[in-house]
Amino acid sequence: MADGTIAQDQAQSQGIWRVREGITSALGKEGAVYKYDVSIPLAELYTLCEVMRARLEAHGALVTGFGHLGDGNLHLNIYTPGRFNKDPAVLAAIEPFVYEWIAERRGSISAEHGLGVMKPAFLRMSKSESMIELMRGIKGLLDPKGILNPYKVLPPLSHS
């Protein structure tokens, strides 16, 4: 952990949120951004940034991270200054490595914003089949017709 801030009042809290919301937007003006919202043990929260910096240096990608100290949530942002199209070689250097690294530390590949369309295939790296089935059951209770974010929440049923 390099630095941290605890808001002392409502105004400071709002200021912190403005900065937080502006980071990814600002990075997007510099180049393509690869965003990951992950949860890892607090002791290794920033280690992932350091590991990814070393891994992506040859690709000219830069890495920044910020998050929630209390719950181990890291917003990992990787960007390619001056290159606005996502590069398959950069993506291949990130995935599945980033998910494997997180799984080895018993973290979660999706901390707070859901799986989207890109992560369901990787969910089994950080969640057991029984946990995924429990998640599927809860989703079924809350959305019995499957109309909320269809195909973006859970991976297909395993046939193993």
Language-model features, listed with the residues they occupy:
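C-terminal substrate-recognition/cap domain of FAD-linked oxidoreductases
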Residues: 1-94, 101, 105
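Short proline/glycine- and acidic-rich turn/helix-capping motifs at secondary-structure junctions
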Residues: 5-19, 110-125, 154-158
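A structural signal for short, well-ordered beta-strand segments
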Residues: 36, 76-78, 113, 119, ...
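Flexible loop/turn segments at secondary-structure boundaries
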Residues: 71-75, 83-86, 116-119, 155-160
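Alpha-helix-loop-beta-strand connector modules within alpha/beta enzyme cores
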Residues: 96-98, 138
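Alpha-helix capping/hinge segments and adjacent helical runs
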Residues: 103-115, 144-148
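Activity-critical C-terminal alpha-helical subdomain
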Residues: 120-160
